[in-house]
Every structure is written in C-alpha cells, then in structure tokens.
C-alpha cells in the first residue's frame, strides 16, 4: 500500500479530544440532556489507503443502519478510526467510555433531584389556601440523548463495562426502540431517531478489567478487525505528527517494527512507541543514530520496559534481551559515518553499552 500526506481536509476528530466545540447541556420538557460534540477537521492526521478502506467498509454498515464494531489490539488506532468514521456522518457525536462501574442508568438516565412548587392563595383575606407539589426531575444520559436526537454514539472499549449494562442496547438495535425505566413517568419508551448511529471499539487481547461480550449484542454488531498499521502508514503518521525528516522517521519505525516482530517482549510495542521516540528525538534535536548516546538511552527508556513487567526476571535473561534490543538499535539506527557497518560485538556495541547505566 502507498501512503499519502494529509489532504486539504485531513481526518476529522472531535472537540472533546482537543478540537472543535461542544454543545452545552440543555433542558427539554423538564429533562436535562447532556452535551454533544461537534466534529471538525484536524491537522496532523494522515489518511492512507488502509484508512480509506476501513472507513469505506465501516460507513457501508452504518449507512445501512447497522451498529459498527472496530476490534483490535492496543495501539492499532481503533478509537481514532471510530472518531474519523463518526465525523464522516456529519452528525453531533456523544462518547461513552466503558467502565466496570457503568450501569444502565448511566446510559439511559435517572431521576436527579426534585422540582418544588408552592402556591399560597389569600384571595379571601381571612382564608389561606396552601398547595404544595414536588416532582422528581428526570435527566437523560448519553444513550437516550443520542437515540432521541439522532446523534452518533461512540462507545469506546465497551467490553470494560459489565454485560448486563448493555441489555438496553438490544432493543435499540433490533426494534429501534429504547425502553425507559418506570421512573421516567413521561414516557416508557422512545422511538430511535432514524439518523442515530453507533460505533463500538474493543480490545480482544486485553484481559485486565475486561468482560466477555454477550452473544446477543455481538450478533447485532458488524465487526471489523483492525490490525497494526502497515509500514507506509506508520511512517506517514510519524513524519506528520513530529515534523521529523522521513529518512530519520523510517529508522525509528523500522526499529520498533523489528522489535515487535521479534516477539521478545511482554508488552507489545505499538505505533505509540514509535511516535514517542520520534517526538522526543525531534524536540531534543537528537541524532537518530547509535552514535548519539542520548538517542540510545531514549530508545532504551521507551522499549526496554516492555521486555520485563517487573524485577523478578533472572539477571542472565534480562541481559540477553537487553543485548538483543541494543543489537536492533545498531542495525536499524546505524552509525552515520558507516551505515550498518558495525554489528553486535563491535565498537558500536561498546558505545551503546557505555551510554546506558
């Protein structure tokens, strides 16, 4: 695949992520509704053929009325892609982040406070008529607002919420009806707006704080698997986000991709690691080469922690894996004077080890 630089209208992101404006909360018929986000273009996003393909496939399901689900490991850009696709729909966006403490009331709404009314009638001077009423105040939450107004709902990492929380979604996607709890009083259900769309993301490889998705919900979702971006996309993103020369960014990208391909880690190094190294190197003016001890230290700080999750690893195994990482640095970020000439065991290795504590 070939990559392209950011176009005149680069990828769209949402106001809640550093750009755009938010529509403030409002009261509607005694209800309080949460604010929605307005999509707007953002510079620094590179749209490659891979992104365009995923966007086209996702919009195909959404335009047909199906909820979309982007599934993939950490660092594959699921959330960014979901926000980009949502922006293409041209509707306000409401975002929910999955959480174990999230309940149905957090999606639909609940009674929040009371509205008091007191009338004192003294039309007849020696007779006082007193009338007092107290009504509970209903507050719409994100799902209800999106269904009522026809907004786009982005539910990020939805498997972090308990499965029973999502029972209310089954009727939304199948019957296009949102059933409200009895406390709502005014209405027991609402008809889902025809423009309502939903986009989910999840990480199937995560195991900490994640619940299995219920079959009834998974069966209603159109799932697209998102893999790690190809080299062309990583290179284009790194160059656009950091302003680094493409040749220097390519060295960092190739280093991290080789480290990921080695499998010699406990936490997978993703494109975030490449961007971390490239951004710091660009800001600090480092030479992307094994000749610069500060750059070598930067790579060590960003990548070595992924080899071991704690201090229990045996010293021998630790040193072996560190040596393998340093060999990759020598290979993919070689000396500028003699590119790729110094291999493991040579003078560059001594320079690498001398740069590290």
Swiss-Prot record:
Binding positions for ATP?
72-79
Enzyme Commission code: 3.6.4.-
Q: Which organism is it from?
A: Ancylobacter aquaticus
Stretches of the chain forming a coiled coil according to its record = none
GO MF terms here are: ATP binding; ATP hydrolysis activity
Q: Where in the cell is it found?
A: Gas vesicle; Cytoplasm
Name the InterPro entries for this protein: AAA+_ATPase, ATPase_dyneun-rel_AAA, CbbQ/NirQ/NorQ/GpvN, Gas-vesicle_GvpN, P-loop_NTPase
Put simply, this protein is called Gas vesicle ATPase GvpN
Per the record, the GO terms for biological process are:
gas vesicle organization
Disordered as annotated region, ranges: 22-43
| Gene3D superfamilies xref list | P-loop containing nucleotide triphosphate hydrolases
* Amino acid composition bias (Polar residues), ranges on this chain: 22-36
User: So what does this one do?
Assistant: An ATPase that functions in gas vesicle formation. A minor component of the gas vesicle, also found in soluble extracts. Gas vesicles (GV) are hollow, gas filled proteinaceous nanostructures. During planktonic growth they allow positioning of the organism at a favorable depth for light or nutrient acquisition.
Output the SMART domains linked to this UniProt entry: AAA
Keywords attached to this entry: ATP-binding, Cytoplasm, Gas vesicle, Hydrolase, Nucleotide-binding
Which domain of life does this protein belong to? Bacteria
An annotated GO cellular component of this protein is: gas vesicle
Quaternary structure note: Forms homodimers, probably interacts with other GV proteins including GvpA.
**Short name of one Pfam family for this protein?**
AAA_5
Family from the record: Belongs to the CbbQ/NirQ/NorQ/GpvN family.
Record field: catalytic activity: ATP + H2O = ADP + phosphate + H(+)
